[in-house]
Amino acid sequence: MSETLERHAFGAEVGRLLDLVVHALYSEREIFLRELVANAADAVDRRRFGALTDPALALPAEAKVRIRPDKAARTLTISDPGIGMGKEDLAQNLGTIARSGTRAFSQSLAEAKPDERPSLIGQFGVGFYSAFMVADRVEVTSRRAGSDEAWTWASDGEGEYTLSPATREEPGTDVVLHMKADADEYLEPLRIETIVRKWADHITVPITLLRDGEEVSGNEGTALWRKPKAEITEETYTAFYRHLTHNFDTPWATLHWRAEGALDFSALLFIPSMKPFLAVEEERESKVRLHVRRMFITDEAGLLPSWLRFVQGVVDTEDLPLNVSREMLQATPVLARIRRAVTAKVLSELKSRAKDADGYASFWQAFGPVLKEGIWEDAEQRDDIAGLIRFRSSAVEGWTSFADYVSRMKPNQEAIYILVGDDTKALASSAQIEGFRARGIEVLLLSDHVDAFWPERLDKFDGKPIRSITQSADDLSAFAPEGESEGEAADLADLVPKLKEILKDDVTDVRASQRLVESAVLLSASSGGPDLQMQRLLRRAGRGFGAGLPVLELNPRHALVRRLAERAKTGEDIAEAAQTLLDLAHVQGGDAPRDPVAFARRVATALAAQG
């Protein structure tokens, strides 16, 4: 053994770290290549920055990171022409965690001008040790720029490392991984290329891969989000969007900006013009990609709330360490501040684009149901989201907003009225709406699945309470019908008590209705309880016990109700008719009769009696 070989024990913290990295820290084994490529690319950036003040550090003309798999030798080599490391650097950066090359280098940049700063440097620190997930021995041969000496650091990750003199013709670093028996896949060029494309496609330093004896490009090499907007064409944005999302449409909106000051990040976000093939309703989490200094970290950082999960893109920050784990991300306040800033930017863009009614309508039809989830989930943004949602209406064609509705309210109208159901056309012809239409009162029609929930969290807009018209408490006496009322109103003094007794197990009340014009009956929700659509959802989910009983409302001017009132007054048995009347109300509201067989029998009997 060479007399110049030096043996050193890892610092105590490294042994613990190795075990953590190999067994717990990283969610995917392929992360090792991301870390090593990032280190190599950052070393190139570091040398490039140093050359600004020391021409002797100038990079070679074609500076690139080279990846060379060797199946015969079972090695994977990552080489770079970067700043390199000397003997002390290797010991300090790879033998302990106490010293951090990145932190030391960051201090030297503290007073540099922004346009002089390269990306903050990923260092041979925590991320480096991920190599031991796939390698049973790692050798790092490095020559520092400006020095003639090269050294090799080597370890099997079992508690010690060695340092020995080496030779390297040019400054830079070679990391050689002796692969474990179960890591054959990482010697396959196509597998390596896939990983590089996934994790490092937009690192600005070129990356090449040795495949079939030839060097091929491994990455695109341009972080589009870091380029000035003026230098990017719409075609380039669209191409990047399609590459990133695997969609084939043109983005409905492109947001590209850089934040500087308290937060330092670049963002390039897209709102698709079409709903993806896999509906966004099925995926609950935002998939905006988090990059740190151009290196992809994760698409599970929650950079946007779930109600903006249709937004795609990249956020690249310099305020996080490159080797931050997904587990650590959730605990850092930096990410929370970025999330708030990005969310505010997207909402601002939507507000601006909402001024173009036709253009906004296309967005709304694709992603409106998802955006409305925010009213239920996000108290902080609830009012802003309320201004962005759109509705069908009983009074106007196309889409309308809360603000538009308020501008059309009748002089003595105090509330915003909504009707929730499964189908807009059915809602527009619903018996629930007859009295409102007769009085010229507009009703907003809500038919998305989420519409049964969010109105519980938004009780008013612009100071106007929001009320479901299926609630029985609405008083329309202040509004005179705009047309002549047809038919004389029946006296229900005898009918109502009898119906209450007959239907006591099925309804909570029976009363005359102000809102019926053409229909004989309708069901409404009792005051203070869930509206009818929520009751339907509870029943469908097997939770009918929480739905409560409806109120049966009667139209005293309808011929059927007048006839029943006469029969009740003369003492006739109206039990069968009462049951049929209630089932008619269910059918009219879009529900099935309580007992379809019994309902059919009663209807057949009634028809036969008329024949």
Curated annotation (Swiss-Prot):
Matching HAMAP family: HSP90
NCBIfam families xrefs: PRK05218.1
Record's keyword annotation contains Oxidoreductase: no
One Pfam family this sequence matches: HSP90
Main location: cytoplasm
Role played: Molecular chaperone. Has ATPase activity.
Region (B) location: 327-536
The protein's assembly and partners: Homodimer.
Organism: Methylobacterium nodulans (strain LMG 21967 / CNCM I-2342 / ORS 2060)
Source taxon at top rank: Bacteria
Annotated spans, C: 537-611
Protein name: Chaperone protein HtpG
Gene3D superfamilies hit by this protein: 3.30.230.80, 3.40.50.11260, Heat shock protein 90, C-terminal domain (1.20.120.790), Histidine kinase-like ATPase, C-terminal domain (3.30.565.10)
Protein family according to the UniProt entry: Belongs to the heat shock protein 90 family.
